[in-house]
């Protein structure tokens, strides 16, 4: 791949999606900002069937089945949309990547289903991961504020207990990843976190000139 593949990650409430939106307004050249996890093509088919046939997926299908669809959608989105962009020489900054899916698999699915995430090994190794390190209490407050603003209650995987589990898992995973990961303090105000990320990206881009 001629372009750089970089991704932001952290527990819920760390600000990764907010940072990606702010980066879209930055002046970084030759860069695409997106997510390989949204617009999940195969999951959307399930949601359409649910609406048309009037059933609840949680009553018919397991978490594991939905996760298979999610992994398939991520792989499809990467090969269909993102890898071609990288091959054309553009840099791509993602909101989350494979380490996040593997973490969810380890924490919330039956142990016998951990093998499912091995399908993600077909995806390219990123050039850099940027970990937004945030305190649990700060993350909980941000999630609560978002819920009040949107009217959407937090997902079960966003509970305080789940956040602690996710943070612990990330700290275990990070040293074992086969690519560089930079950790930044995401407890600071949004503008400071944004500037920290922007400085890191400018340094990465400078080394490729």
Please describe what each predicted stretch is.
Residues 140-209:
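NTP-dependent small-molecule kinase module
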Residues 11:
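P-loop (Walker A) phosphate-binding loop of NTP-binding proteins
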Residues 8:
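Hydrophobic anchor at the beta1->P-loop junction of P-loop NTPases
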Residues 17:
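Walker A/P-loop
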Residues 101-169:
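A glycine- and Lys/Arg-enriched "phosphate-lid" helix/loop adjacent to the NTP-binding pocket
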Residues 37-114:
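ATP-dependent small-molecule kinase phosphotransfer cores
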Residues 14:
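ATP-binding Walker
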């Amino acid at each position: 791949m001629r372009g750089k593949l970089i991704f932001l990650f952290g527990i819920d409430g760390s600000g990764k999606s907010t940072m990606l939106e702010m980066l879209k307004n930055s002046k970084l050249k030759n860069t695409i900002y997106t997510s390989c996890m949204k617009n999940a093509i195969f999951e959307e088919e399930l949601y359409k069937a649910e609406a048309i046939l009037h059933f609840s997926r949680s009553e018919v299908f397991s978490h594991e089945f939905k996760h298979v669809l999610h992994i398939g959608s991520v792989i499809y989105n990467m090969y269909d949309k993102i890898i071609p962009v990288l091959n054309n020489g553009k840099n791509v900054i993602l909101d989350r990547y494979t380490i996040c899916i593997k973490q969810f698999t380890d924490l919330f699915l039956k142990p016998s289903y951990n093998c499912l995430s091995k399908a993600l090994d077909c995806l390219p190794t990123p050039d850099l991961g940027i970990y937004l390190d945030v305190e649990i209490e700060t993350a909980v407050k941000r999630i609560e504020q978002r819920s009040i603003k949107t009217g959407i209650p937090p997902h079960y995987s966003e509970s305080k207990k789940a956040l602690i589990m996710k943070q612990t898992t990330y700290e275990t995973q990070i040293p074992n990843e086969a690519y560089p990961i930079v950790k930044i303090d995401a407890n600071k105000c949004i503008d400071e976190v944004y500037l920290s990320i922007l400085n890191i990206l400018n340094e990465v881009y400078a080394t490729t000139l």
